[in-house]
Design a protein with these regions (language model features):
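A well-structured
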Residues: 1-314, 325, 600
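Post-HExxH zinc-binding segment in Zn-dependent metallohydrolases
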Residues: 413-442, 450-452, 456, 530
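Short pre-active-site segment immediately N-terminal to the catalytic Zn-binding motif
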Residues: 319, 370-390
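Conserved helix-loop functional segments at active or binding sites
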Residues: 330-341, 367, 395, 399-407, ...
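Catalytic zinc-binding patch centered on the HExxH motif and its immediate surroundings
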Residues: 314-319, 352-371
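Long, K/E/R/D-enriched contiguous segments that form extended
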Residues: 296-340, 374, 398, 445, ...
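Post-HEXXH active-site segment of zinc metalloproteases
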Residues: 388, 399-423
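C-terminal, non-catalytic "cap/extension" segments appended to globular domains
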Residues: 11-15, 22, 26, 114, ...
Length: 600
């Protein structure tokens, strides 16, 4: 057996594969000096308190000064967070992050007056400010975003009470997280050789991918039998969460918790319902995929613990990082040379922290900002790793374009559009790979890779969204969220989504208890809408060429300058209709048909 590759210390990683934090601050001492300097922004804010409605010049002067402050504070945060993530065990950078957090709390408190004061300026007066000071036009979007919440903003005294209550609002999620991640323990299981295997939240999916059905079944039962024994506790967490959301929605004069959550990012409630309806209308594609999985696994009975097992062996070789970059550049060529030039700049100028090292934060992410985005990877030289590079650089270039083309107040895009650029890159990559292979096995592997991603992102997240809607409606009717009600509904949804081709094991009724996303307040549906929008955009780019690419770049450059629905319309996608979701689901169905032919 080959020896396991040793994970290097941070100091042992080749510099060219580390991100250039020196572009933010050349030394830690300069960061410390900048933090001291940033403390002046707190008295600066206090000097403007009570004066924002005084004159056009005062309002403009404050907004400009706040932009400058936010840029400098953003650099401070970027450096401290990136350095901490390089080695999470490094006490020096953990202390630096602690200093940053203390400063951010004080800074946020100092600026708490801004929203109420801007809302308090009457419309005629603000219109007059705009005419007197044309430079305020730059802040029109920011001001309108704040002022559109006027109907949901309370009196000063009531807002103080809401702020105090807000300190408790995270408690259900935090208690649930501590229970799931720190307190709960699952019985060990054993493999065919009698070796003990530990079941944890982290090891669960790898165990579900195990080739031995007995290992999968044992892990499945270990996980869900344990959650079943605590189901009344976990139901109480969610019941408390829903009561918190209902309190906030009613206090702010919303008709429902769904409306309150979506109004914050200017997404119409109908978008949520359209997604669920479109998935329901196309559920036969998922049923067909389940039946294909059953056939390819060669089993008489497919179970819920069989859904993660690979059904096509990995036909691809190892893909080293340097080779992966070249493939990605070719795959994204339809986006034009200007896009590729920025991508190459990111590859060459150390925007990316590539390889795993001792203590490095796990996973992958992109962080936008000045002077350029930063991307964290834990590269493994696999197909999955190549898709991760394409995905995270999609985020990075979205941030790059937004910051380049928008003033600071409009540069940040909302979550509803955040996954579009990253997923668009993934779709272009899989299409390129499929167009450049004649090997049936490799083609089947690539298609299955995409289908699994699609199933997990569109179908699964929509099922979660539907369950979340059920919980909110039940709670809003005045009914407590009991464990039995949650288990019954969750089991019913699994039966509907997966169909008759699978045995829906009774244990799956407990799965809701291990899903942290149900504390995220109508968040997960955006994964499904973002994936669907990306599929539609990638298809336009590949079929319509330059016109579609030009539209897509308008989307990338729009930042937060409009509401998210309008921004997606720039790229030719209207998420107020079911069309983009239907188009994506049609693609899923077509790929299943091709998969069947390849595996016949």
């Amino acid at each position: 057996m080959a020896a396991q590759k040793k994970i290097p210390k941070r100091s042992e990683v080749d510099k060219q594969y580390t991100w250039a934090t020196e572009d933010l601050f050349a030394t830690d001492e300069l960061w410390e000096k900048a933090l001291e300097d940033a403390k002046k922004y707190i008295p600066m804010a206090e000097a403007y308190k009570g004066r924002l409605g005084e004159s056009a010049d005062t309002l403009y002067g404050f907004l400009k000064a706040r932009d400058e402050a936010n840029l400098k504070i953003g650099r401070l945060a970027n450096y401290a967070m990136r350095k901490s993530d390089e080695d999470t065990a490094n006490s020096f950078y953990n202390a630096m992050k602690g200093k940053l957090m203390s400063y951010l709390v004080a800074n946020e408190s100092a600026y708490a007056f801004v929203t109420p004061e801007i809302i308090a300026i009457d419309d005629a007066k603000l219109d007059g400010f705009m005419q007197q000071k044309p430079e305020l036009k730059e802040y029109e979007r920011l001001l309108s975003r704040i002022r559109r919440m006027k109907a949901h903003t309370l009196s000063d005294a009531e807002e103080r009470i809401m702020a105090l209550a807000g300190q408790m609002s995270n408690a259900p999620g935090e208690i649930g997280s501590a229970f799931r991640n720190a307190d709960i323990r699952f019985p060990d299981i054993h493999d065919a050789e009698g070796n003990a295997l530990q079941v944890t939240q982290g090891s669960f999916i790898p165990l579900m991918e195990n080739g031995d059905v007995n290992v999968r079944k044992a892990a499945f039962e270990s996980m869900y039998h344990t959650f079943a024994s605590f189901k009344h506790t976990t139901a109480a967490f969610l019941d408390a969460q829903m009561k918190t959301l209902i309190f906030n929605a009613q206090a702010r004069h919303y008709d429902s918790t769904l409306e309150a959550a979506l109004d914050e990012t200017e997404v119409p409630v109908q978008v949520y319902h359209n997604l669920i309806e479109a998935v329901h209308n196309n559920i036969e594609h998922l049923h067909k995929y389940v039946n294909l999985r059953k056939k390819l696994m060669g089993v008489d009975e497919l179970h819920m613990y069989d859904l993660y097992t690979p059904i096509v062996s990995n036909a691809t070789k190892k893909i080293p990082y340097e080779e992966a970059k070249e493939i990605i550049l070719k795959a994204l060529a339809p986006l034009g040379q200007d896009y590729l030039d920025i991508l190459k700049e990111g590859f060459s100028n150390r925007w990316i922290d590539v390889y795993e090292n001792e203590g490095k934060r796990s996973g992958a992410y992109s962080s936008g900002g000045d002077p350029h985005p930063y991307v964290l990877l834990n590269q493994q030289d696999t197909l999955d790793s190549m898709f991760t590079i394409a995905h995270e650089m999609g985020h990075a270039l979205h941030s790059y374009h937004s910051i380049k083309h928008q003033p600071p107040c409009n540069a940040h895009y909302v979550i509803f559009v955040a996954e579009v650029a990253s997923t668009c890159n993934e779709v272009l990559l899989v299409k390129y790979l499929l167009n450049n292979t004649t090997d049936k096995r490799e083609r089947a592997y690539l298609i299955n890779h995409f289908l699994e991603s699609f199933r997990g992102t569109v179908y699964r997240q929509t099922m979660f969204a539907e369950f979340e809607l059920f919980m909110s409606r039940l709670a809003e009717s005045g009914t407590a969220l009991t464990a039995d009600a949650l288990c019954d509904k969750y089991y019913e949804l699994n039966k509907f989504y997966f169909g008759d081709g699978i045995t829906v094991d009774k244990e799956i009724a407990e799965e809701w208890a291990r899903i942290p996303h149900f504390f995220y307040n109508f968040y997960v549906f955006q994964y499904a809408t973002g994936f669907s929008a990306a599929c539609a955009i990638a298809n336009r780019i590949l079929t319509e060429g330059e016109t579609a690419v030009a539209d897509y770049k308008k989307f990338l450059s729009a930042g937060g300058s409009m509401d998210p629905i309008s921004i997606l319309k720039l790229a030719g996608v209207d998420m107020t209709t079911a069309a983009p979701v239907n188009e994506a689901l049609k693609l899923f169905g077509e790929l299943i048909d091709e998969m069947e032919e390849l595996m016949a």
